[in-house]
Amino acid sequence: MKEAKNTFIFSIRTYTQRGKMKKPLLVSFLLLTLILGACGGGSLEGEEVTITGALIGSDQDGFRAAFEPFMEETGIIVSYQGSDNFEQEIQIQMESGDTPDFALWPQPGAVVDAANRGYLTPLADLDIDLDEYQNNFSSYLVGLGTVDGVIYGGANAANLKSIVWYQPAEFEARGYTVPTTWDDMIALADQIVADGMNPFCFGMYSNGASGWLATDWMEDIMLRTGDGVASYDKWVSHEMPFNDPIVKNAATLLSTIMHTEGYVVGGTDAIVSTYFGNAQDPMFSKDANGNPGCFMHRQASFITGFWPEGEKEGAGTITTVFPFPSIDPSLPAAALGGGDMWGAFNDRDATKAVAEFMLSAEFYNNVAIRPDNARLSAHTGFDTSLYAAPINKILGDTIAAALSANSFRFDASDLMPPEVGAGSFWKEMMNLAVEGPGYIDTALDTIEKSWP
């Protein structure tokens, strides 16, 4: 066992982005440790388990840190490989039969697709306590990785998307008030433009995944219009067509943000060419008059991992968030989020051990204490007091409460069939940004026709 301590194979190519455990699960992990220790160093010592995904930067470092105590206790070597084209490459690997032990997808819809094609191993075959899993991660999240009653997906990280980043001091200095409704936000944007500045940062270039930021805007709007969560769920499952009037209304509201003169720093050219990880940078710089480049940035909680080093410590204080504004006040509050879901390609003993650890609350203990961590545990029992970053305590509590109240909804594009959610939806949002509001009908009709 000693020789395996602190061993970690970590291979990354070009990068783009894209807790308290229940007692039975803790006992099972401790039993695993005792069993391995009783076997003269452990029958799994030196076994390598491979994982592929799209984690980058500080996210990849946190993912590595999560496995350190597990590797120390079991002797299993966890190897992670990331790629800027993970979504495309994992398809090639599955079709060729040359798969890793796990894939970590940011799209549960891709997990379902892989399961439907016969590539994934059910969690039951990994000896996972399914009741425990559902209790710890909510029936909603578990359902996202379920096909015909069989659970294939393991929930991992979560992030909150229904937030807008801003700097309170910059608002206060100019007498701006945090908006609570869409109309308030538009009025504030108009005031900022009238004052000679740009209200929004907005950049959605992401190499092969360009366009997903606009889909996030669409999803937040969909949750707050029409019939709220009910119509959102119908949209995701295609009970509601993509060119339905409710969806067109959402696209029209999004177009207001993208195409109103002066709203976005750099205009539509910047929207389609600015790397999403750098999109908020103008907020952190000042012009000759001391004005920031933008005042609001609608982006998920993970974005702090992409901020300039000098700004990360101010997350939750100097730069914090307000909830995405309500649009129809008659609808109950809802929270949009995203996250990672893994699938396993075999049921080796080492794979089973890693799967059980990844579903434990303790999996995130070593991640949470990192000051640069921007990922949040999706485990409803995770001890959020462990988060080192002040903003993570706020966001972590919000996610846990939303999951418990069944008001949390996953990113729609990540739930749709890959050819739509990670294909035509992304592409047509890029086209919409370039072509303008007159392209809305064409964009929605094109996406509708692409649905398999």
What would you call each of these model-derived segments?
Residues 108-163, 186, 192, 213, ...:
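Hinge/lid segment of periplasmic solute-binding proteins
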Residues 92-94, 100-101, 130-169, 199, ...:
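A structural signal for short loop-to-beta-strand junctions that line the ligand-binding cleft
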Residues 68, 95, 173, 302, ...:
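Extracytoplasmic/periplasmic substrate-recognition and gating elements
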Residues 150-156, 186-240:
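Extracytoplasmic/periplasmic solute-binding protein
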Residues 87-88, 204-206, 227-310:
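Extracytoplasmic ligand-binding clamshell segments of periplasmic binding protein
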Residues 46-57, 76-81, 102, 152, ...:
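Short, well-ordered beta-strand elements
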Residues 374-381, 393-452:
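C-terminal capping/gating helix-and-loop segments adjacent to ligand/active sites or protein-protein/ligand interfaces
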Residues 66-137, 143-146, 169-180, 295-296, ...:
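Extracytoplasmic "Venus flytrap"/periplasmic binding protein-like
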